[in-house]
A protein has these predicted regions:
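Conserved PLP-enzyme active-site core in the AAT-like
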Residues: 1-179
């Protein structure tokens, strides 16, 4: 995982007793901004440490920079691992896939790149209330019953109907107006 992961990821690591393998994001020499994670560094980590079970990438990062998720997904799956993308600041990307192309930048939404699990914070770049988010299971690789069990342990038994309603309204608006 990148060292630029959200603090909730670090909390999950502690709860799960998981020791992370860190990959430092590239830094732009001119601006000092963090760039995306280098797919070759991810592959090197997977080759070096056979105990790695999943790879987590934050894309876009806090500066809006996207990693090459398609290439990373290909590498991670070649090594038989799960790819999780924290796309908290990129929930809007699936509505802008038409931007891909001329400049060669990886504009595609992680959900369309073969990623196994994608977390979207819909309140950051879409239209839902603060605190609303979606956990997308995009392939059959993740253990969905186990994920559901863990979520039941951590989530409240009294969900916010305001947040759920805002997610419904958000998806309705985007379905009608999103193109």
């Amino acid at each position: 995982m990148g060292r630029n992961s959200h603090k909730s990821v670090y909390g999950a690591l502690r709860l799960g007793g998981i020791d992370p393998v860190y990959i430092m994001p590239e830094i732009d020499g001119e601006t000092g901004l963090q760039l995306g994670l280098d797919p070759d560094k991810i592959e090197a980590a997977l080759i070096k440490d056979l105990d790695i079970k999943a790879v987590l990438v934050t894309s876009p990062n806090y500066y809006g920079v996207l990693s090459d998720i398609e290439r990373i997904a290909s590498i991670v799956h070649l090594h038989g691992r799960i790819l999780i993308v924290d796309q908290a600041h990129g929930a809007h990307l699936k509505f802008f896939d038409y931007l891909r192309g001329e400049d060669g930048l990886p504009h595609r939404a992680a959900e369309n790149c073969g990623v196994d699990i994608v977390v979207d914070s819909t309140h950051k770049t879409l239209l839902s209330f603060t605190g609303s988010a979606i956990l997308n299971i995009c392939t059959e690789r993740p253990d969905v019953p186990r994920i559901s069990e863990l979520l039941r342990m951590l989530h409240t038994t009294s969900p916010s109907y305001l947040l759920m309603g805002s997610l419904d309204i958000n998806q309705q608006i985007l379905r009608i107006e999103g193109s």
